[in-house]
Amino acid sequence: MSNISKETVEKVANLAKLEVSETEATAFAGQLGKIIELVEQLNTLDTTNVEPTSHAIDVSNVLREDVATKGLDRKEVLKNAPDEQDGMFKVPTIMEQ
């Protein structure tokens, strides 16, 4: 059985930069203790004949084939640009050199 103290909840909340009241810390301590007890029950399961998996269901790659196609012409792309210079998009300076 795992006991989570109110102090442990407050310490973890502080590390996570979360504010919890005394009432919340007490409530969370009880709730987290119950959650840990439920998870600890999984350790009692016999998994000797269970295949290891990374997904609960079979997952297959459903992406299309990667086929190269002709892209847009530079002039066509730049005609929608708010500003361009030497055949490239011109953007406002955000840093000085």
Curated annotation (Swiss-Prot):
It catalyses: L-glutamyl-tRNA(Gln) + L-glutamine + ATP + H2O = L-glutaminyl-tRNA(Gln) + L-glutamate + ADP + phosphate + H(+); L-aspartyl-tRNA(Asn) + L-glutamine + ATP + H2O = L-asparaginyl-tRNA(Asn) + L-glutamate + ADP + phosphate + 2 H(+). Transmembrane segments: none annotated. GO terms for molecular function: asparaginyl-tRNA synthase (glutamine-hydrolyzing) activity; ATP binding; glutaminyl-tRNA synthase (glutamine-hydrolyzing) activity. It comes from the Bacteria. Coiled coil: none annotated. Its EC number is 6.3.5.-. It holds the Pfam family GatC. Keywords: ATP-binding, Ligase, Nucleotide-binding, Protein biosynthesis. Gene3D superfamilies: Glu-tRNAGln amidotransferase C subunit, N-terminal domain. GO terms for biological process: glutaminyl-tRNAGln biosynthesis via transamidation; regulation of translational fidelity; translation. Belongs to the GatC family. Allows the formation of correctly charged Asn-tRNA(Asn) or Gln-tRNA(Gln) through the transamidation of misacylated Asp-tRNA(Asn) or Glu-tRNA(Gln) in organisms which lack either or both of asparaginyl-tRNA or glutaminyl-tRNA synthetases. The reaction takes place in the presence of glutamine and ATP through an activated phospho-Asp-tRNA(Asn) or phospho-Glu-tRNA(Gln). Heterotrimer of A, B and C subunits. This is Aspartyl/glutamyl-tRNA(Asn/Gln) amidotransferase subunit C. It comes from Listeria monocytogenes serovar 1/2a (strain ATCC BAA-679 / EGD-e).
